[in-house]
Every structure is written in C-alpha cells, then in structure tokens.
Amino acid sequence: MGMLTEFKEFAMRGNVIDLAVGVVIGAAFGKIVTALVEKIIMPPLGMLIGKVDFSQLAWTLSPASIGADGKEIPAVVIGYGDFINTLIQFVIVAFAIFLVIKVINRLSRKQDAAPAAPAEEVVLLREIRDSLKK
C-alpha cells in the first residue's frame, strides 16, 4: 500500500475528521470567550473596582530611561492585568467544557440504562417453551 493511500485512509477516518472539526470549533469558541471577557465581563468589573482597565495593570520593575549613549532603554514591566484576563478566559472555557462533558456523560448513562430488547430468536424460543409447558 502506498504512503499516499495510507495517508488518505488515515485522514478520512471518522476520528481524524471529528478532531479537525473540534479544533476549528474550539478556535472559534476561544475568540468568542476572549471577546466576552475583554468586552463584556472585565469593563463592568473594572468599573466596580475603581475604573480599572485590567489589561493595562502592570508592575514596573524598572522605568524606561535614556542610556549613556542616548538610546532609550525600555521599561521592565510585569503585565499581570493580561494574566488576569487570560485566567478568566481559561476558567470560562474550562467550565464550558465541563458542562459539555457532563451532558455527554448523562446522555451515555441514559443509553446504557435502557436494556436491550431480547432478540427475535429468544422471544420465539420463549414462546415455544411456554407452549410446551401447557
């Protein structure tokens, strides 16, 4: 079997296609969550805390300065505001995934709980057995 044929069989398997669709949907969902956090959740939260733009929060370890040669030395800054935004995004995504898995588990338990109907042969054999008992 040629390498191209093997790759085609691999790529056309259901799991690979499902994974690709999941990655695309996940990327789109990530953009939605980013917009939700940055544009909807954080502005009111910042207003409640004191008109703070979380993405601009930072600790300046060393301010910008001009070196002896006249070149600007950039500031050394720890931008913890972006970290807070990213952390909130992670919590939202993790919670959404938790809810999806919870629903999937509930649906699979319902399918497992329903007993399978006996096969037609089994029903026929039971009828024969019952008629012989008479």
Curated annotation (Swiss-Prot):
Cellular component, GO annotation: plasma membrane
Keywords tagged on the record: Cell inner membrane, Cell membrane, Ion channel, Ion transport, Membrane, Transmembrane, Transmembrane helix, Transport
Annotated GO MF terms: mechanosensitive monoatomic ion channel activity
Location within or outside the cell: Cell inner membrane
Chief location: membrane
Highest taxon in the source lineage: Bacteria
NCBIfam families: mscL, PRK00567.1-4, PRK13952.1
Family, per entry: Belongs to the MscL family.
SUBUNIT field: Homopentamer.
Protein name: Large-conductance mechanosensitive channel
